Amino acid sequence: MMWSNFFMQEEDRRRTAVGRRRAQEQQNLGLTPEREGKIKLGLLVAIVGATLAVLAVGTEFWVELNTYKTNGSAVCEAAHLGLWKVCIKRLWQADVPAGRETCGPAELPGEANCTYFKFFTTGENAHIFQRTTKKEVNLAAAVIAVLGLTAMALGCLCVIMVLSKGAEFLLRLGAVCFGLSGLLLFVSLEVFRHSVRALLQGVNPETPPAPRLAYEYSWSLGCGVGAGLILLLGGVCFLLLTLPSWPWRSLCPKRGGPTA
């Protein structure tokens, strides 16, 4: 009877020690509330950038192409396009602001004809106001933008895994993904600018002559610029969180500490 009590006590001690060890390991693997709050704040910044990026890539108000108003005509034409489709609108000149020489802005009510670009399917160029797109440049801008969205999604997944599973080694990968997505968005914007210039120069030798055009970048492109900046900021924030804390403590000593 005495030996059985001894073995039972030893078994209880062993189980208690194992439970304490496992609890200590889980505590070491977990995130402190302060660090978890910083990561959540960085994720919130990244989500704002991701929302702007999806809004920019999914809409077709990257650039507006406006014809000049003509005397004796009650309507004029304007177009707005993005990465995937183009919309040509017929606007009433009476709705156009009086001090404006060109037709537009494209947000005015009017008859719209929207079509998706065919160079994603059949490889055909689009014709806008007797001008031809350069499909290679447009395709490059769209593909780079999609790669940026993919990197952004991977970054969000990495940060979510850090918060849910405590896998802090994924934080650096998430920082790289967010920074890469911001850079890819900026590259896509620059390539799209080149595609607009190529479109304006691609006049078809047809009759009647191609109308004069004026162009202006619209709010979708502004969302893309904002998304790129915010995603880069999010990547930098996550990268700073992966750095060791002791260099910053040495640069910012606590008040009231011992002095030499």
UniProtKB/Swiss-Prot annotation:
InterPro entries: PMP22/EMP/MP20/Claudin, VDCC_g6su, VDCC_gsu
Parts of the chain that traverse the membrane: 43-63, 143-163, 169-189, 221-241
Keyword match Transmembrane helix: yes
UniProt KW keywords: Calcium, Calcium channel, Calcium transport, Cell membrane, Ion channel, Ion transport, Membrane, Transmembrane, Transmembrane helix, Transport, Voltage-gated channel
Gene Ontology MF annotations: calcium channel activity; calcium channel regulator activity
Main location per the UniProt record: membrane
Keyword check for Calcium: yes
Cellular component annotations (GO), alphabetically ordered: L-type voltage-gated calcium channel complex
A Pfam family recorded for this sequence: Claudin_2
GO biological process annotation, one example: regulation of calcium ion transmembrane transport via high voltage-gated calcium channel
Recorded topology in the membrane: Multi-pass membrane protein
Expression by tissue: Detected in heart atrium and ventricle, aorta and skeletal muscle. Detected in heart left ventricle.
Subcellular locations according to the entry: Cell membrane
Role this protein plays: Regulates the activity of L-type calcium channels that contain CACNA1C as pore-forming subunit.
Subunit structure: Interacts with CACNA1C. Identified in a complex with the L-type calcium channel subunits CACNA1C, CACNA2D1 and either CACNB1 or CACNB2.
Family according to the record: Belongs to the PMP-22/EMP/MP20 family. CACNG subfamily.
Protein name: Voltage-dependent calcium channel gamma-6 subunit
Organism: Rattus norvegicus (Rat)
Taxonomic lineage: Eukaryota, Metazoa, Chordata, Craniata, Vertebrata
Underlying gene: Cacng6
